[in-house]
Amino acid sequence: LTFWSGLAFGKSSDIMGIKRNPMGIKPYSSVDENLFLRGAAAEVGWKKLNFLLFGSKKMIDANLQEDSTSSDGDITVSSFQSSGTHSTIGDLENKDALEETVFGGEVSIKDRKYTIGLITALSLYNGNINRTLSPYSQFQFNSNFNWVTGAHYNWTHRNFNFFGEISRSNNNGIAQLHGLMASLHPKVSVSAFYRNYGKDYQNLFTNAVGEGSKSINEKGILTGLDFKLTK
């Protein structure tokens, strides 16, 4: 919810797919040209504590404003590009138009039955973001700076697994999720998942379970029952 840059599937019939397990530092193997990170990362464990730091700087595609003039020399962009296609003159002009700097870290305590942690990520852009916002998109990210912080937990007790996360963006938008998975019988498993993603939550690196591709403006409860006829 607070930070995710890898592949993740949305809501599906798989009741165990409601939980995203953190993968730590992994090489990016997708073909997306904008959502990956390029930089350095380090992870250190000491007893029950785990520390992770990362930093990234790269160019991303963005739509340049044709009439943009800035006294300080900064560019002005009207939107971010994510298609990765550069088949027209306009696409080529928008390629690598904006510099993105991202850095952050996580500290967590891991025990045999539980994990709790704090995570933060700071995103900076070297241009002026000036999106044309409509009433339905008035809460979208429209700045060159965003600071997201979050806390997460995971607790296992016998056949029950409780997990959740709460996150806050720089504009005070809040998003949270909480879930339960339980094995009641070798053939019967149940799950429950509550999500409340605020309409003003702003995070370009979120990929939580939900109806939409962005973890914003959603509230609901998802329940599941898995019954195996044969084993």
What is each stretch, according to the model?
Residues 1-231:
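Outer-membrane beta-barrel channel domains
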